[in-house]
């Protein structure tokens, strides 16, 4: 396992290099890219990052394209909610 501390966490491997604000940004990205996400297909928290923008569910085996560090990018969430809202307006 790599070097880490209680406060710095996953970015403890960088030591005092690169500045505190940059390390905080990197910490947010690295924590999200290594965490498990909810699978829309099987309903379990089993989706992990395979490569940049490729996410796969360990349980059901489905593979989904997403963001580089998170499963759903903020713009994709906005587009999805807009499409859902427009679909509801046309139906009702």
UniProtKB/Swiss-Prot annotation:
> From the Swiss-Prot or TrEMBL record, what is one GO molecular function term?
structural constituent of ribosome
UniProt keyword Zinc, yes or no? yes
What biological process terms from GO does the record include?
translation
According to the lineage, what is the superkingdom? Eukaryota
Q: Where are the zinc fingers (C4-type)?
A: 39-60
Q: InterPro entries from the xrefs?
A: Ribosomal_eL37/eL43 (IPR011331), Ribosomal_eL43 (IPR002674), Ribosomal_zn-bd (IPR011332)
UniProt entry tagged with the keyword Transmembrane helix: no
- Recorded protein name is Large ribosomal subunit protein eL43
What phylogenetic lineage does the species belong to?
Eukaryota, Viridiplantae, Streptophyta, Embryophyta, Tracheophyta
